[in-house]
Amino acid sequence: MPLGLKPTCSVCKTTSSSMWKKGPQGEILCHHCTGRGGAGGGGSCPGAAGGTGGGGGGTGGGFGAATFASTSAAPPQSNGGGGGKQSKQEIHRRSARLRNTKYKSAPAAEKKVSTKGKGRRHIFKLKNPIKAPESVSTIITAESIFYKGVYYQIGDVVSVIDEQDGKPYYAQIRGFVQDQYCEKSAALTWLIPTLASPRDQFDPASYIVGPEEDLPRKMEYLEFVCHAPSEYFKSRSSPFPTVPTRPEKGYIWTHVGPTPAITIKETVANHL
């Protein structure tokens, strides 16, 4: 039997039985009283059976009469007010048990949905594995870059140290290249020294333009020397006031502060 209040037979008032059944009027009957009602005649057959089993003895007849009286008196009691109240109480108890049973069966429904016995390998095998796309090299060219705190522009002079003799060799930057991994490189144009070139420093006036390299070099092997010289390396703009042949716009260099920039007319007048 489920946990809770124990049922009581409406006929014999017993609380223990191997089987409980419900009568036609809603009363609860034990297994013994259910067998009596099914024998026929409101319990007349159990009395007759008791008399027959007793034979000629008076004891058997007395037991049968007592049994008949108890069974015949039981139905009117069940039809009365007290029996009706108890039957309603039992119906209420039964409905409460049914609600508890439904409440307890809810986790069982969740177990059906749960993936029992399926581990992480099953989750990862739901879809077929797909190879990652191959990386495509993307090159971005630029006219200026910022590398290790130094602002490089096209035309700047850099030095490269040779691994064999350890001497510096100078070159001019022709362009900048950046790949998909943000690795920066520069295309160089070598500067050839002359007999008048000093050994300890770089003098732009004593160098001539040499061959151009086809492959760019990484910026980590280059060391900044100076920005683009004004006249010798054919810079389109100059930091110094010169006599221009035609009006020029878009200078890289500018004045810092309230001092106005030198105009072309003032420059020409000073030189004259």
From Swiss-Prot:
Q: Which residues carry this modification: N6-acetyllysine?
A: K167
GO CC terms: nucleus
- Biological process, per Gene Ontology: chromatin organization; regulation of DNA-templated transcription
Please list where the region (Disordered) is annotated.
67-120
Query: Which superkingdom?
Result: Eukaryota
Places the protein is found = Nucleus
Q: Which InterPro entries match?
A: GATAD1, Znf_GATA, Znf_NHR/GATA
Tell me what gene encodes this. GATAD1
Instruction: Tell me yes or no: is Membrane among this UniProt entry's keywords.
Output: no
Recite the UniProt keywords alphabetically: Acetylation, Isopeptide bond, Metal-binding, Nucleus, Ubl conjugation, Zinc, Zinc-finger
Question: Which source organism?
Answer: Bos taurus
Query: What is the recorded name of this protein?
Result: GATA zinc finger domain-containing protein 1
Cross-link type Glycyl lysine isopeptide (Lys-Gly) (interchain with G-Cter in SUMO2), residue numbers? K265
Gene3D superfamilies the record matches: Erythroid Transcription Factor GATA-1, subunit A (3.30.50.10)
Instruction: Indicate the secretion signal residues.
Output: none
